[in-house]
Amino acid sequence: MSLLSVSSVLLAQKERLKVELSSSASVSSNSELNPLWSYSNQWGIYSQYEQAELVVHGKARYDLLDKDSVDLQVGLGVVGSTNFDHSMIHEAYLKGRFYMIDFTVGMEAFSPLAKYDDLTSGSYLMSSNARPTPRIGLGIFDWWSIPYTRDWLQIKGGCYLGMLFDEDNPKYTKDVILHEKFAYGRLGGWYVKPYLGLVHSVMMGGTSPTGEDIPIDFWASFLGKRSEKFRDISSMRGEATNAAGGHQGLWDMGLDVDFVGNKVHFYYQRMFKDNGGTKPFGTLNKDHIMGIHVSFNDSKWLSAISLEWMRTSDQLGDGTPDPIGYDKNGNLIAVYPGDVPLDEKGFWKWIYSHFTQADIEAWENETGWILNQWCYLKFLREHWDNGPHGGRKNYLNNGLYYQGWSAGGLSIGTPLFHSYTTQVKYMNGEGKTPNYAFFTNNRVDAITVGLSGGDGNKLSYRLKYTFSKNHGSLCEKYEGGAFGLHRFEDYFYTTSKKEHYIVINVDYKLSESLSINAMLSADWGELYDAVALRIGAKYNIRVKR
């Protein structure tokens, strides 16, 4: 084929090239920590610890196909920083659509769930907070009306399979597979559209810091089921009795309202980690994210407003995940699901190997119950008197995977959780945090307010403010972590700590291609104080063929 004919084909396919070049310089008043909203929910482009930083960010997307039924693009993005360790290939992907089916391969700064991350605290899972990780994705990423329903039944959903980065930390598990999926349904066809969705994220496989290979049972992890592949590995008993891999989930429900062109989105989300919180309308789980986002049709200076309340402080209470206590031999034992045989002979053999007849009779006389296979959990709880078990959910953390749901030192979920590295910087040697897991402050109650607008032409702004009460972690405050029975007397979060986060971003278009921007952010409260300023410019190139 001649060069002329190739060019004709490209022209007929309406291929186009989009290039965006930006540069910025920032400085912070705090030599250890930058204000939260100066770097969060921005795909990990900016450093959370560099006091002064110059960043150059370039990205390009090239449309290979652009048809009604199919499109295909390739993209590449790079970040250069005066902090050389923060320089990286940020994006490299192939993505497209075949009829209603979307697909992607590689690292792309995109999440189908991150809708209002610039005005809210951000998505609890699959957020825009950290740098993109390599993955393959397939699904219907936006609402699609089921044929012959006249838009009354709409669905969206998708599955991703990828890898976490092998970062230089001796505590990290290497070669970790990350699987994420979501499924939503909505009643459309009217100006009020109720919806319900489920999001599930799971880590599986890898090599532990001790060099031990973690078996992969894909379908058990996919479905959140236990796996016999872990039965003979003493350090991974929980995978054989609870669920294979590390799991996080989210129920997402709400209303989309379109009123005279103004769009209102009400949402209520409930996070969970295992069966203890999987019921979308159950009363056991008290943690949630609820909010409202309003986009105004004809308003310029106030084009959108959001209000959100996040609570993750309960985590089903202080009780250990499973029953734990001292048996008649003085041994501290944790009882996992499946440890106690349910057949008559096996059950009593297990009971008498750990408890005396006097223990059993004392409990039966006090409660009026008769011990058997179906009430042994009540016996264990009340005999050991350590409170209800099934708590300490430790959101976005996992015992097998120290790094939890993080990439590049940032949460791939909500940015309001603090890592151990961050906490050490603001503790200033006060109190104690033993560092059992990556996120040492994941019990947070927060209110976030966001505003955006402009003159409708050249000037635009975004303002976001968050007030938070930080309670640390239920696992970090006990000696021994998740199954610890004794609290640290000098735990840093013995009392909750209040913190404020605020940011304002202003953009001004000098031309269709060139704009300048400024960001002013500040944090203050009982954790740390910091003020940061960033100024920058952005240049866009769009070529249509």
Placement of each model-derived feature along the sequence:
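Sec/Tat signal peptide C-region and signal peptidase I cleavage site
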Residues: 8-12
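Exposed, low-structure sequence patches enriched in small/polar residues
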Residues: 194-198, 209-211, 215-545
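Transmembrane beta-strands of outer-membrane beta-barrel pores
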Residues: 23-31, 62, 76-82, 98-100, ...
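Transmembrane beta-strand segments of Gram-negative outer membrane beta-barrel proteins
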Residues: 13-54, 65-76, 155-161
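Transmembrane beta-barrel architecture of outer-membrane proteins
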Residues: 18-20, 49-57, 87-91, 133-137, ...
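Surface-exposed loop and membrane-interface regions of Gram-negative outer-membrane beta-barrel proteins
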Residues: 66-98, 110-129, 167
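Short loop/turn motifs that connect adjacent beta-strands in outer-membrane beta-barrel proteins
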Residues: 13-19, 60-72, 97-101, 143-157, ...
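Internal, well-ordered domain-core segments that constitute the primary functional module
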Residues: 113-217
